[in-house]
Amino acid sequence: MINFPSIFVPLVGLVFPAIAMASLFLHVQKNKIF
């Protein structure tokens, strides 16, 4: 539990932008289709 933040913080720092980019990409693709 002591090392949890040192693993959790970089993980969120990488996963959150990846999800944001993926959702933005899908949103743009959906707008292009329709």
From Swiss-Prot:
It is a single-pass membrane protein. It is found in: Plastid, Chloroplast thylakoid membrane. The chain crosses the membrane at residues 8-28. Signal peptide: none annotated. One of its GO terms (cellular component) is photosystem I. It comes from the Eukaryota. Its main location: plastid. It holds the Pfam family PSI_8. GO terms for biological process: photosynthesis. Coiled coil: none annotated. InterPro entries: PSI_PsaI, PSI_PsaI_sf. Disulfide bonds: none annotated. Keywords: Chloroplast, Membrane, Photosynthesis, Photosystem I, Plastid, Thylakoid, Transmembrane, Transmembrane helix. Belongs to the PsaI family. May help in the organization of the PsaL subunit. This is Photosystem I reaction center subunit VIII. It comes from Glycine max (Soybean).
